[in-house]
Amino acid sequence: MSDMNAHISEWMKETEESPIVMSSRIRLARNLENHVHPLMFPSEQDGFRVINEVQDVLPDLDLMRLDTMDQQNKMKLVAKHLISPELIKQPASAVLLNKDESISIMINEEDHIRIQAMGTDLSLQDLYNIASEIDDTLDQSLDISYDEHLGYLTTCPTNIGTGMRASVMLHLPGLSIMKRMNRIAQTINRFGFTIRGIYGEGSQVYGHIYQISNQLTLGKTEDEIIDNLTEVVQQIINEEMQIRERLTQYNELETLDRIYRSLGILQNSRIISMEEASYRLSEVKLGIDLGYLTLSDFKFNELMVSIQSAFIYNDEDETISVNEKRANILREYTQ
């Protein structure tokens, strides 16, 4: 069973944090024949029937029905990237999770089924193999919507075809500081890729963290999408590394000032917003990656989750604000 109070999933603890690649994800969107799409369910019972059908095929995964959860626990799942903010809005929705939470299957978001396989490093092909195996299991027992000319049929036209979204989460402080991200976004957009915020489409960028993903799925195979995205991501990584080298060679004093100012704020602030905290943490991580800082308890990925309101807020203790609690946590982990 998923631990709602664990700040990061077990799969994220298995490897050392990378300087740039935070995580990779493969998502497959699937719909069921003879069911209206989730956004058009006549009643909640239609949604619960879909949940039961999917759960029956995958009994080894833990089911969490969102209608039985409070808002704070729902937001914890969002913070850990196990569900999307959109899933919360659906009255009859659920998520299936494996033990280490590297597999997350959203039920009744925009589509009936969204299979997610998540991992560290640039492991897109391995993750696709995992997601594809689950997809095959579902396909053997359920009537999946598929057209021999178009491919998998999805609610959003941009997902029609393979129904696959491949994405990589990158920490790019160098490119952000040098204001290169708009140019990169325009360039990769011409090749069918996009840059989004930390929680996908329409979300805000926090802590110089960007999600790079494919935009279209029609007309390309899964392998082509994965290969092309991997190449694009590798080029962005190379450019980030070049910028970091330039920051140390030609702008070292300014870079050190930026890093140590952020460290000082994290070590001494008494109240701090999520937005400011994320950027200060990003610059401290940059300092660690460049070899300027050594902080034994500093874990960027985990801190970026644990300082979110869902993990801080306690309605039984209203004497201390979320921003104050956040500052207390950050002082503890940046000494």
Swiss-Prot record:
It catalyses: L-arginyl-[protein] + ATP = N(omega)-phospho-L-arginyl-[protein] + ADP + H(+). GO terms for molecular function: ATP binding; creatine kinase activity; protein kinase activity. Residues 20-243 form the Phosphagen kinase C-terminal domain. Gene3D superfamilies: Glutamine synthetase/guanido kinase, catalytic domain. CDD domains: bacterial_phosphagen_kinase. GO terms for biological process: phosphocreatine biosynthetic process. ATP binds at residues 23-27, 81, 114, 165-169, 196-201. Keywords: ATP-binding, Kinase, Nucleotide-binding, Transferase. It comes from the Bacteria. NCBIfam families: PRK01059.1-3 (NF002193). Belongs to the ATP:guanido phosphotransferase family. Catalyzes the specific phosphorylation of arginine residues in proteins. This is Protein-arginine kinase. It comes from Staphylococcus haemolyticus (strain JCSC1435). The lineage of its organism: Bacteria, Bacillati, Bacillota, Bacilli, Bacillales. The gene is mcsB.
